[in-house]
Amino acid sequence: MTLGEIIFGRRPRPTFLTDAPADVRWRAIRPKPGPAVEAHLAQDNGFLQSPRGHMRYRAGTHYLITRQDGEQSVVKRSTFERTYRQRPDGQFEKRTDIRYRYFTLPHTVVVGTQEGPQRADAGDWIVEGVDGEVWPVKPDVAAEIYEPA
């Protein structure tokens, strides 16, 4: 126990979330047309550091995506192949005919994503994808990339 914990007590740990709570309000969304991304199938196993946590990837199982702003993410191969299409220039774009849904929570949670645990703060969107997978998105980012379906 640290001195801070002795004086102030232990900070509560965020709830670990793998499924949506039964009482959440779902909202339907779809991706907006957006800029292309670079993507390639992982050739080895590893971890990618993001602001929300470490995302693991496996050779042949995950795509590594790099957005125009340099932010990187990991997407399971089967999900990537269902939700992205390749452009003639070799880059990829998100399909806009795919529907997702999301909910928000009034408290911080750790979301169990396919790529590893990621932090979601109060008010962040927790999006459910085509395979039932969930991931957190900051509200300002979500407003840029999703629209009501």
Question: For the regions a protein language model found, what residue spans apply to each?
Answer:
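A motif-centric signal for short, conserved binding hotspots located
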Residues: 2-71, 77-131, 140-149
